[in-house]
Structure formats: C-alpha cells, structure tokens
Amino acid sequence: MSFLNTYNLLLRATQRVIVLTLFATALVMAGCINDEKHTPEDTTLVNVGDTAPDFTVKLLNGKSTTLSSLHGQVVMLIFFSTECPDCQNQFAEIQRIVAEKEPSFKVLAISRGESIETTEEFSQKYGITFDVGTDPDRSIYDRYATLYVPRNFLIGPTGRVEALTIEYDYDQLHAIWEKAEQMSK
C-alpha cells in the first residue's frame, strides 16, 4: 500500500470520527435544551389571575419606584437580560412601536441580574424612552419566575396579572400590547 493510499484512508477515518463526535454532541445538547424539567410554563411563579408581587426598583434616572405606586394604572412589566438575543429583538420592536405611538399605559422594564452601567448601555443602544430599572441580585425577578427572558406581565389597574408572554414572539408581543391599549382606555 502506498503512502498516499494510507494517508487517504487515515483522512477518511478521521473525518468519520469528527462527524460522529459532532453528531453525538448535537444529540446531547438537544437533550439539554429540551429538558422538560425547565419549560417556560414550569418556571413561571406568577400566572394570569394572580396578584403581581410588589417590589421597589431603582430606575436608570436615579429614582426608585414601587409597583404598588402604579396601582390604578395598566402596567406592562418586562423582565429582560441585555445579552439575550430575544430581548434585544423585543426591545427593538417595542421602541419602534413606542416611536409610532406613545402607549396609553405604563411600561416598566427591569434588567435581570445586571449592573446599572450595563443596563444603561443597553437602554442607550436601543433608544429606550420608557422607564428601565435594574434588579442586580434578581430578587424581583425571582418572585415572578425562575428562568427565561424576556417575560412580559400585563398588570391591570387592580394589580392583577391579566396576561403574560414568555420569550419573544412578534405576534404575542403585539397581542399583549393591544390588550394593554384596550385596558387603559
């Protein structure tokens, strides 16, 4: 057997091992991603019909606000992470909606587990014009859910959760936004 034939056989064998390794890795990763123990629904602590837990949050403008101080108003409470691609897409869409028409309800976004500086950079990047706060230790977020962002909670004037969405979906975002507009008329 010539050197070239031996080389080609080794090359093909190596390629097969690499392909099989990648395939096996993909199967393992798919199993982790689809782990039924961590579905968005199972990680939700506050559901439609529940009273939204009160909290105090520090806003990027330096002031603080409480959810209870917004009692009587319709509130869209958004939990997000600045590094989450779905959150970035959602904020780009929300800011586009807000630029077309100022919402008739209160929008309050809270970054989960991030610093004021990181959240300010994100807010500036997306040109966010509504209130944004930070929850660096996740103490607020952990009262509402255990995993997954973005999460949008539509809270009615009585403090009850009227609707919620988990992760970014264009149609769901527009549906909950429209419901907030209808409720605040």
Language model regions located:
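N-terminal targeting signals for export/organelle localization
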Residues: 1-52, 172-181, 185
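Short loop/turn microsegments at loop-to-beta-strand junctions
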Residues: 52-53, 75, 149-151
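Short active-site neighborhood of thiol/selenol oxidoreductases, capturing the structured segment around
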Residues: 65-88
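Loop/turn elements at helix/coil->beta-strand transitions in domains of secreted/extracellular proteins
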Residues: 72-75, 103-106, 130
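Structural microenvironment flanking redox-active thiols in thiol-disulfide oxidoreductases
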Residues: 88-126, 136-143
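Thiol/disulfide oxidoreductase modules built on the thioredoxin-like
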Residues: 124-128, 136-181
